[in-house]
Amino acid sequence: MKKIYIITGANGFLGNNIIRNLEQNSENEIRALVLPTGITKSLENLNCKIYYGDVTQKDTLTTIFENIKDKEVYVIHCAAAVYIKTAYNPSVYDVNVNGTKNIIDKVLETKSKLIYISSVHAITEKLNHELIT
């Protein structure tokens, strides 16, 4: 059975390197999700098809999930917003929580498998700045 890999955050450091690893097996079909405004230079000459979408906009995820019936589909969710400053940034929540929910919904809807890559913003800091273990 043909395997399809859908990589979110495909033009980021991790997503790009995952694609480089997956493309070593020429039987893999690799679908790279990139923001509509994303730079795709790092994906040039890689064995992947680029799809434009935004994990925070569920309707933009439809195309990348098309034509997957009777195929083994793995979604590797690398898309994330990282904001190092201490001030609250609502886009971090929107991408990392709402965007991940949209990906999970599509995975469940299509009976795909999910590999979730977390971010530094998955857990808030403790109030007294203790290390989280």
Question: What spans do the regions from the language model cover?
Answer:
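Conserved glycine-rich Rossmann-like NAD(P)H-binding loop of the short-chain dehydrogenase/reductase
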Residues: 26-38
